[in-house]
Structures are given as C-alpha cells and as structure tokens.
C-alpha cells in the first residue's frame, strides 16, 4: 500500500484574508470551506511516495529566550482567547503544516512538524476554529471566547485517487532570493538608516508555573491562597501560570549613524511591586534584548544564534519556498527554514514572509531548536513584523518574545519555572529626523525622565496603543497584596540574604557572611564582623565597616568607608576609606581571591604570602560620557614586613638590615573607554556587563616621597585592552592585552608582581601555574586568551551531546624585564642597588612565561574543570641553589560558571 505525505504551509502570525490571496499562486481546488473563503494555506500539492511514519516522527522545534510579551489590541474589558492543541490523522499521527485559523478572521497559524499549534487573540468575534489541509476533510470546532482552550483535531482522509508525483530538488531560485535579501540589507534594515525617531510601548510580564504545587503547605495556602484567583494559562506551553510581575514602558527612541546616536528616553514606566526609584526601570524599554534579524547573528542571553536572514544562512539552515501570497496588494514569499543536518550550534526553526519587490522582511516566526546548548531555557519563541513607511521604506512594527526558564529541560508538574513575555509596539516613526540637541547632551544611552514613574492611570490610558485586559490590570493589585503578607517578607529576606551576602534589617545590613570565618598561616583562625547602612538610612550616603581578629597573631584588623552618591545617572561618587588588614599582593581580580572559608580550604599548601597593609584613600568616580568612565584617587599606603614576606636591604657586602615597612603617597588616575556597553546601576554600585567592542583602560599612578620612612617617588603607567570576540558557530574568545612600565627606583612590593594563583579555584585574571611572588618586572606585557567553543565539537558526539558540555582552551603569556636599579634578586650583581632584596624564590622573567590549559565547562550547568600546563620556566632554583622541576608544572582547577 502506498502511503503519501500531505504538505501545507506552516504559517505563524497574520493569516491572509481572502482579498490578500494571490489567485495565481498555484493552489488546487477543494481547499475552500464555505461560507468563509479559502485561505491561502496549502502548498501546491506535493505527494511523496514514502512511509507516513518516517515523515511525521520528526522532532518539533522549541526552546527558549527571555522576553516579556503582551497580547493584541482590544478593549479595556476584553479577555484573551487562547487555543493550543494537536492535529492528527485518524491513526493518531501528527500532521505538519495544517492550517488552524479562526473563521471569518485573519488570525491563524500552522502546525509544526509534530502537528502541534498554539495561538491567542483579543478578537471578540473569534469563536469557530478550523483545521484545514489538502487531502483531508476540514474540521470546525466551537471554542470558548476569552478563555484557554485545548483543542485537538482528528482529520479524516479524503478518498480521492491521486497520482504520485516525482519531485526533484532545485534550490537555485531559493538561493537567488536569499542573495537578493542580502543585497537589499542596507536599504531594508531600519538600523542602517541615517536617522530615525519613533515612539515605543513595551510590556513585560513574568509568570510562575506550577504555583499550586509550590504552595501545597497549609500555612502557605493560608497566607497566599488568594493568588489562585489570578491564574491563567499559556497558549504556548499549555501550562497554568501565576502572573508575578508586569511592567509597562512608554519611550521615545532616537537613532543616528552620523553623528552616531542610539538613545532611549523613557517617558513613563511602572513595574508592579516596585517603587518609583528602582534600578530595574532601565531594562524595561526597547533597548535591551534586541532581535534584529538583519544582523548575521541574534544575541540571545549572550548566545549567538545565526539569523535566517544571514548572508551565510545556507550553512545553518535548509530553506523552502512554500508559497507566494498577495499581502496588502504586494507579492510576498513565504519561506520555511529548518536546521541543516549536522549543526551542533544553537539554531532557529520557523518561517518568514519576504516582500517580493523590495526583498524586505515582512514577518518572521522562529523557535529555538530543541536540544540547543543553552542553559535554563526550555522554550523560546520570537515573532517580529515590519511595516512599510512611505513608498519604499521598511520599519519595525511589532516585536514579541516568549521564554520558559526552568532548571530542567523536562516537563514536570512539580518543579516551578518562570515564563517571560515581552511585546514592543513601534509607533509614529519619523525617518531622516535627527535627535534634538538636548537628547545628544544626555550622558547615558537610556535616560529616565524624572516624572516617568509618577504617571497616573489617565495618562497611561491615553499612552497605550491598546488597553490592558482585566487580568493584566489585576496583576498590580495582586502584587501589592502579596507585599503586605508577613510570610512573604520573611521569605524575601532569606532569599535576599543568600543572593546579596548581607542580612538586612531596616537600617543596617550585617555581612558579608562569607567572611565571618576563615583561616591562614599568619593569622590562624580569623573571625570577622561587618556591615553597612541600608537605603533606609540614606540613598545618598552609605557607611560600611568591618572588624577582624586573628587568634594566631593576636591582632585586630579593621576598616571603614563613607560613600557619597552625588549622582546615580550619570555616575558621580565620592568615597573616603581606610583600613588595616592582611592582604595578598600580586593577586588577580577574581572575587574568590577575597578572604573566605572557601578560599581558605582550597588554598595550595605553602602558597599564602600575605602582608599587613595600612591604607587610606579618597576616590572620585565620574562618568563623563557613556563611553568614558574615570576614577581619580589619593592613596596613602604602608606595607609591613613579616616572616613569610620579609623586607631586607643590603647594607654591606656581607650584611643586610631588616626593614619594618615601606610606604607610598599616590595620585591614581584611571580612564576606561568603552562603546555601547550594557551596565547596571544600583543605588550605590555600577556594574559593567557586556560590550561588543574592545574596552580600553589607561591606568596612571604617580607617587611622591613624603615625610614617612622608606617612601619612594616613581611613576607607573599601564594600558589594557579587553575584548570578547564572537566567532559563531565556533564560540567566542576573550582576549586581554596589557602593557606597562614603572619609571623610578622602587622596592619589590611596588613592582609589577605578576598575578599568581595560590588556590585550586579557577581565576581567569591570574596565571594558574604561577605562585605568588614568583616573578616581578618594571616593564611588562601580557596576553590572556580564552576560547569557549560552546559545545561545537562535543555537541557532535551522540552520547556526550546530551550533557551539553562546552570545551574551553586557554593561553596565558607574559614577558617582562627588570632594570638594574630594581633588581633585588638575592646574589645578583646589582642587588645592593635595589631598595629591598627579593624574597626567596622570587626572580625576574628572563624569557616569556607561557602556560596553556584545556577544560570542560557547563558540567551540570554549574561547574567548570580546567587542566593547565606550564610550558616555560619549568625548572626553578631551590633553597640550596640546585635547579629542580617546578611543582606547578601541572595544575587542575575548578570553578563555578552560571551562564546561559
């Protein structure tokens, strides 16, 4: 018996009305369904002789991206109608490309390769749902309006005698279309326009799934039982969810190429449960999580996913021209794309509509292909539509995203997951208009107007392009009610303590708790208490301090600081600080280098070489421009000798003298240059997250000899470049180049002490096979290079592929020289000229130091294990003067990585 596959069109987004159908598109008869005209939903019938089971058992695409999506236009009291289900034949096999649409509307979708579909609408007339595909009888089912409906169709095959057709692949026309899309990229991409101004409305929503399972406890139900009145159901996953956050933002967006402008002025914003002065508002506009498919790659949570419109799209996708439509009087191609065979990187699966005259993107619907090597994301859907402005210009119309965040990729009714939704509406575009002068003067890429969080309900009613549904309006009331439940505040405090490291009260926060207890060979057991004031005391000033005691050295240590936030946006902060504490000189910048119980446990034996440091500083941080951040500081520092890091100087050919301490009086200036960098702004902190461009830092330090003993005058300069180079599909590289020089005569604690790692914890800012105080220079240059392949190779191995491991290679190198006046190597010809003799084992770099490593990251989505080999300086001089193999020729490290 011959089995045949019936193909239709996989359509997501706007369903063509009868007047939009291209009569010459080649459809056969028998597709229509009276009284409604037949939608253009089937490809010219292609009958392929093969077993149905082999065709229909292809896996469906689905994975995730964080988004905050909204619904379509409707009245203030309109409710959203949601439908989800599956279309099968009489034997239960899923049918792909079946048109599922609401009768007498332009709303419809197509089933995926497993026969699944989902959609939602605010259209109050949508009550009859139809499933239609050539070769089967149409089926109509009435659904409940304004509610969630799960509707499964079981289509009956039409008994029609048809002759099998022989199909030969010919993708020359498809390649020509893709080439034309690439040729017209400059004119169709809105971001390549010289200037434009537009209004945006962004709505985000965060939902919690399986809420009933999480609140089974009687006490929880007694306190939070009322929230179940606000439950809803997702049309994508079919899961019931509890809305926990909603935000709305109305903004004006400015874009320009020459002069370069990329700014957003937020005119109004409100977030359920948050006050008007919150740090989250800066991320609620349209500037973040951009989905411009004209770019070669879409950056989703720092994962580069090839765009179906990419010039090299044929490497990642197989394309199928499935239809030609007449949309708004213009011929439009419908193109399906599926991941190419053998692709191990993250890719999309979906469909797009391309204008046949301008080769511009009209609509696109994508899902992240299931099995993609992305953590914490189970489902992802991106929908984007563009509109014609004027006669020949394409511009944004709507951008919708959906994501299911979960700790497991499996469906489970017991584990909670979060659904993120975002929808952006673009309105009133004006092309060719430059930004106003006052906008160009704004020092930040996202500017929040002072009255943005104080807009009333009447203002919002007029500002929205469509009204909120009743359920959406109730989210604000529900979140406010939850905040008044005492148990909620207790749970919030526990979670906040774990995340921030501080136990907060209304006016004071105790911590960080990770430093309460630690131990080292100088202090022995060490206990520390500390804390800082909270914004409940002041949002302009913050006091912090700590007190520590070592039971072995029997000494108290301590410190404190006063921060004065002059301006949060742009940043202007003045800080006064002082402390006396044990510090490790020559360490990297990793947070794991700070004193804690974990670093104490994982410290290599004999690697601790801490020094007591007494320092006072006044520092001024100033964000002059978004691309230029500066820091100016006056620092007074004194470093003390101890038995592990002794300070001695040569007084004669046969004698040395003990030096108690050395000091410096520094003027420190740092300038940091970056472009289009994403930052977070807290009340007192500013953190740098990401930039697609190199970040250059210039560090200048001048020191003058004062009235204290053993002080020195010198000048130190250092320039560094940090760049994350994206190389999809083979991952991304992190490159850091540094060069510096010290002019003057200085003791060894003030030289460039090349960064060692005294622990088994991965520190990407230090040399894993190098000890503290092993090498020093006064002229140096270094290279840190790390490449993460993102599973490019391991993803091709069947059994390992499911583990989602990611391969990493690392190269670290440094070369430096030491002038005679600073060469304090014991026994060297010029050691008597140096201010201090070097500690035993410390020397200069007489040749480049190189180490390399290989590792596997994303183990259990948390851990990373690396193995490093020391390629040079493998022999070191022992205490008896004999050269021996370094004990650090091979080192294994472990680290934590939380990445998507």
Predicted segments with their positions:
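Hydrophobic beta-strand segments
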Residues: 98-102, 128-129, 167, 198, ...
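Short, acidic Ser/Thr/Gly-rich low-complexity loop/linker segments typical of extracellular
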Residues: 106-116
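Structured extracytoplasmic
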Residues: 159, 168-332, 339-347, 408-409, ...
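A short, solvent-exposed loop/turn motif at the edges and junctions
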Residues: 102-104, 130-141
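Short Pro-Gly-centered beta-turn/loop motif in secreted/extracellular proteins
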Residues: 93-96, 118-126
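Structural motif
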Residues: 81-95
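Exposed, low-structure sequence patches enriched in small/polar residues
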Residues: 298-305, 441-900
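Extracellular beta-sheet/turn segments enriched in Thr/Pro/Gly and aliphatic residues
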Residues: 143-169
